[in-house]
C-alpha cells in the first residue's frame, strides 16, 4: 500500500495540533502495516503554500505551473490511501489547504463534467480511503457554520476518492484548561481514538 500523508497547518513551526495527530496516527498505522510505503509532505515547504488563485494567474494559466498542479495530481493518482491534516483558520481550513485544492481540482485530470447533463465524475477512484485529521481552537458546536472537516471530506469525494473513515476533530485547543497543556499531552489524551482509526484505516 502507498500511503500519502499531507500536512497543511499554518502552525507547523510553532507546533501543530493536527500534525501531532497525523504523526500519532501514522505511528499506530505502521505498527500494524510495517511494510506499507509512507510519503509525508508538509505543503508549507512547497510553492503552492504562497501561490493563490487570482484572476490574472487563472487567465494566463500560470497558477497551475507555480502550484505544481501535475506533481500533486500524480501523487494522488499513485496513492492507495491519504492521510490529510490541517487546522481551522478563521472558521475554515487553512489558506494553504485552499491552494492545494485549487491546484488539484482540474477538469479532465481529477474530474469530468458532462456539459449535457451537468453530471460530475471524480477520477481519483484509485484512492481507497482518506483519513482526515483536523484541529480547531473552539469546542465543537461553537461555530456551526465552520465545518471545515466535512468540507474536506466532500471535496475528496467529489474527486472520486472513497472516504470510508470518519474524520477526526481535535477541538477546544484554545480554551482552558486545554490551552495550558503541552500539545503532545493534549493529543495523547485522545490516543485511544486515534489508534482505533489507524487500526480500521
UniProtKB/Swiss-Prot annotation:
Per its UniProt record, what InterPro entries does this chain match? Flavodoxin_fold, Flavoprotein-like_sf, FMN-dep_NADH:Q_OxRdtase_AzoR1, NADH:quinone_OxRdtase_FMN_depd
What SUPFAM superfamilies does UniProt report for this protein, alphabetically? Flavoproteins
Q: Tell me, how does this one assemble?
A: Homodimer.
Q: Which GO terms describe its molecular function?
A: electron transfer activity; FMN binding; oxidoreductase activity, acting on NAD(P)H as acceptor; oxidoreductase activity, acting on NAD(P)H, quinone or similar compound as acceptor
The chain's coiled-coil residues are none
Name the job this protein performs. Answer: Quinone reductase that provides resistance to thiol-specific stress caused by electrophilic quinones.
Pfam families given in the database record: Flavodoxin_2 (PF02525)
Cofactor annotation comment:
Binds 1 FMN per subunit.
Any keyword Oxidoreductase? yes
What's this protein's family per the entry?
A: Belongs to the azoreductase type 1 family.
The protein in question is named FMN-dependent NADH:quinone oxidoreductase
The domain of life for this entry's organism is Bacteria
Question: Which cofactors are named for this entry?
Answer: FMN
Query: What organism is listed for this UniProt entry?
Result: Mesomycoplasma hyopneumoniae (strain J / ATCC 25934 / NCTC 10110)
Tell me the keywords, alphabetical order.
Answer: Flavoprotein, FMN, NAD, Oxidoreductase
Does the record bear Flavoprotein in its keywords?
Answer: yes
Query: What EC designation does it have?
Result: 1.6.5.-, 1.7.1.17
Show the catalytic activity. Answer: 2 a quinone + NADH + H(+) = 2 a 1,4-benzosemiquinone + NAD(+); N,N-dimethyl-1,4-phenylenediamine + anthranilate + 2 NAD(+) = 2-(4-dimethylaminophenyl)diazenylbenzoate + 2 NADH + 2 H(+)
Which residues are FMN-binding? 9, 16-18
Amino acid at each position: 500500500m502507498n500511503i500519502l500523508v499531507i500536512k497543511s497547518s499554518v502552525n507547523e513551526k510553532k507546533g501543530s495540533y493536527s500534525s501531532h495527530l497525523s504523526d500519532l496516527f501514522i505511528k499506530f498505522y505502521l505498527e500494524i502495516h510495517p511494510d506499507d510505503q509512507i510519503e509525508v509532505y508538509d505543503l508549507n515547504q512547497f510553492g503552492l503554500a504562497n501561490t493563490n488563485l487570482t484572476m490574472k494567474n487563472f487567465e494566463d494559466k500560470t497558477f497551475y505551473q507555480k502550484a505544481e498542479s501535475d506533481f500533486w495530481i500524480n501523487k494522488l493518482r499513485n496513492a492507495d490511501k491519504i492521510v490529510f491534516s490541517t487546522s481551522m483558520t478563521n472558521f475554515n481550513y487553512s489558506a494553504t489547504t485552499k491552494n492545494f485544492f485549487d491546484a488539484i481540482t482540474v477538469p479532465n485530470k481529477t474530474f469530468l463534467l458532462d456539459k449535457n447533463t451537468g453530471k460530475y465524475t471524480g477520477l481519483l477512484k484509485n484512492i481507497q480511503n482518506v483519513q482526515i485529521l483536523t484541529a480547531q481552537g473552539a469546542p465543537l458546536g461553537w461555530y456551526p457554520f465552520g465545518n471545515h472537516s466535512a468540507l474536506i471530506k466532500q471535496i475528496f469525494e467529489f474527486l472520486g476518492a472513497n472516504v470510508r473513515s470518519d474524520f477526526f476533530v481535535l477541538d477546544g485547543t484554545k480554551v482552558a484548561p486545554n490551552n495550558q497543556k503541552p500539545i503532545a499531552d493534549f493529543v495523547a489524551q485522545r490516543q485511544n481514538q486515534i489508534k482505533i482509526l489507524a487500526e480500521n484505516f
